[in-house]
Structure formats: structure tokens, C-alpha cells
From Swiss-Prot:
InterPro entries: AlgH-like. PANTHER family: UNCHARACTERIZED PROTEIN YQGE, UPF0301 PROTEIN YQGE. Pfam families: DUF179. Belongs to the UPF0301 (AlgH) family. SUPFAM superfamilies: VC0467-like. Coiled coil: none annotated. One of its GO terms (cellular component) is cytosol. Gene3D superfamilies: VC0467-like, VC0467-like domains. This is UPF0301 protein BCI_0481.
Length: 187
């Protein structure tokens, strides 16, 4: 099982504050473990414009299709001082890895320097930190029904309102995740 370019959808029983009602985009998954970015937990009052200001990058706003007021996300509890940019494919960035034909992840700031130019990716999602699983850990969590999984899509990743991503991802499976109960009983 390879869940690269899939979403993990937190089950309602997951109560850890970092992952409660979360959607995680899996960037890599192999025999060594998995790495993903939470895509629906924005950092309060921190936007792409804030990141650019902090990095002393002055965006060119005359051609900006990327919204500078979009939120920055808490991608997970690991390396939360590092930036990770998920974006639609565009060549020429220093530290990029292809996730799928529709998405890449970049950890170098050169992708941010292209915002507002014809070299910018069509869509971006900026996160601080990432979520990681050691070998076998994610598989164990899946067997414990901690997560639902679906193939990822760019509509949810980039265009769905942040507050609706958890429900929208579950809806692809044909379920209303709000109707799943947190407890089971015995007859």
C-alpha cells in the first residue's frame, strides 16, 4: 500500500488537538514511513504575505494570481520552524520533489520569490512543519480506524475553503463524517 498523493481524513474519534478533524496530504510513503502536511489547520493571523515580509521578499503584485492573504498552515508537529510549500508543478526550484503529476513540494524559498511573476506556480499551499510516521506506524493507525483515506485532488488541496476541507474530503467517500459516532455499543 502506497498512500503518496492521498488524503488522510481524521475519524471523529481522533481527539489529539493537532489532528482532530484534520486532513493530511501525504507527500511521501514508503517502507521507511510517511510524511504529510495538514492542509486544514491554519496558523492564526499568519498569511503568505506575513511569510514574505518575514523573509524580506517583496512580492510583485501586478501579476499575482496567488492570494497573498491566504493562510499559512500548521503542517504538523515536526520541524515546525521550517517551511514546506505544496504547489502545482513548475520547474526551476532548488529543493523540489514531485509528489504526483499535479503536485510538488518545495522547501526552498525560491518558489516564494516567484509570486507575482509569470514563473509562479498556479496554486500554492504554505505550511510550517510536517507530520511524520515511522515504518509501520501509519499502517497501524489505519488498522485502528484512526484515518480514512482517499486519493488526493487539487480542488480540495487548493480551492476548497479551509473550514470545509474535512467534510469535503469525506464526502468523496459518500459519507457525512459528522454522522459518524465517536462511540460504539453492544446489543
Amino acid at each position: 500500500m502506497n498512500l503518496q498523493h492521498h488524503f488522510l481524513i481524521a475519524m471523529p474519534t481522533l481527539t489529539d488537538p493537532l489532528f482532530k478533524q484534520s486532513v493530511v496530504y501525504i507527500c511521501t510513503h514508503n517502507h521507511e514511513g510517511a510524511m504529510g502536511i495538514v492542509i486544514n489547520k491554519p496558523v492564526e493571523q499568519f498569511t503568505v504575505a506575513s511569510v514574505l515580509h518575514k523573509l524580506k521578499i517583496i512580492p510583485i503584485v501586478d501579476h499575482a494570481s496567488v492570494q497573498l492573504n491566504q493562510p499559512v498552515f500548521l503542517g504538523g508537529p515536526l520541524a515546525d520552524d521550517r517551511g514546506f510549500i505544496i504547489h502545482t508543478p513548475k520547474d526551476g526550484f532548488g529543493a523540489s520533489i514531485g509528489i504526483s503529476p499535479q503536485t510538488m513540494i518545495t522547501t526552498s524559498k525560491d518558489v516564494l520569490e516567484t509570486l507575482g511573476t509569470h514563473n509562479q506556480p498556479d496554486d500554492i499551499l504554505v505550511a510550517l512543519g510536517y507530520s511524520g510516521w515511522e515504518e509501520g506506524q501509519l499502517e497501524h493507525e489505519l488498522r485502528a480506524n484512526t484515518w480514512l483515506t482517499i486519493p488526493a485532488n487539487n480542488q480540495i488541496l487548493f480551492a476548497t475553503p479551509v473550514s470545509a476541507r474535512w467534510q469535503a474530503a469525506a464526502k468523496i467517500l459518500g459519507i457525512n463524517i459528522n454522522n459518524i459516532v465517536n462511540q460504539i455499543g453492544h446489543a
